[in-house]
């Protein structure tokens, strides 16, 4: 079990998962990343856990009530300041999450609070892991209708995650094949693009030179 850390996640991917749930359920439990067009994006921070060999992102929430499927995070003074809500966790492709560097936080007070929260999570990592696995199992079993209704559709999102990985890997592969042939040399398409760029730059230089000569003659 790797040591816990705080992570941020690609917002485009989060939006993609929300749309997948909306299409099937008519609503989504994937956390909202925006409060509205006139307001800034919501800060997203969470931990990454492996649940049934799938990486899951568990958002840190300002919600501070004890529930069966969340974990309260306490500050050094013993006060609950946030929580991990396992019914809102969602699967992510490996490598998509980025470590949230607490040292980069400009606000000193907030930086200290984040550090306290992370220390508390690390201290209780085993409990956090067990709670995540428990919630995942309970939702998949579907015996608690209220829990299922108020949780992400883990099966659906895992399939959506696989589709995201497949499509993005395919796009990367296509871009690579366009640039390089099997013998390691630049492909014809790549050479043409390079030639077009050089021709464009050369034309711009000639225009600039003509303009300079015209200005000097005036």
Place the predicted regions along the sequence by residue.
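General N-terminal targeting signals
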Residues: 23-26, 31, 65, 72-74, ...
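Residue-level detector of flexible, active-site-proximal loop/helix-junction positions
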Residues: 13, 64, 96
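Compact nucleic-acid interaction/catalytic patches
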Residues: 35, 39, 50-88
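C-terminal terminal-subdomain/extension
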Residues: 77-180, 211
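Extended intrinsically disordered terminal tails
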Residues: 1, 170-218
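Short beta-strand-centered aromatic/proline hotspots
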Residues: 44-48
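GIY-YIG nuclease catalytic motif and its immediate N-terminal context
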Residues: 1-40
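Residues at the C-termini of beta-strands that transition into short coil/loop
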Residues: 10, 61, 93
């Amino acid at each position: 079990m790797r040591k816990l850390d705080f992570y941020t996640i690609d917002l485009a991917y989060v939006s993609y998962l929300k749309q997948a749930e909306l299409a099937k359920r008519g609503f989504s439990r994937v956390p909202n990343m925006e409060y509205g067009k006139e307001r800034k994006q919501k800060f997203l921070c969470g931990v990454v856990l492996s649940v049934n060999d799938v990486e899951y992102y568990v958002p840190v929430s300002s919600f501070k009530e004890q529930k069966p499927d969340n974990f309260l995070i306490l500050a050094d003074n013993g006060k609950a300041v946030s929580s991990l809500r396992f019914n809102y966790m969602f699967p992510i492709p490996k490598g998509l999450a980025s470590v949230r560097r607490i040292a980069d936080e400009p606000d000193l007070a907030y930086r200290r609070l984040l550090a306290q929260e992370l220390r508390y999570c690390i201290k209780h990592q085993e409990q956090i892991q067990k709670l995540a696995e428990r919630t995942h199992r309970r939702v998949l079993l579907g015996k608690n209708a209220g829990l299922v209704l108020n949780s992400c559709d883990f099966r659906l999102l895992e399939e959506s995650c696989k589709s995201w990985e497949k499509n993005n890997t395919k796009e990367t592969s296509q871009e690579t094949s366009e640039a390089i042939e099997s013998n390691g040399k630049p492909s014809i398409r790549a050479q043409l693009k390079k030639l077009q760029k050089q021709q464009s730059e050369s034309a711009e230089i000639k225009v600039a030179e003509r303009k300079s000569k015209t200005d000097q003659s005036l």
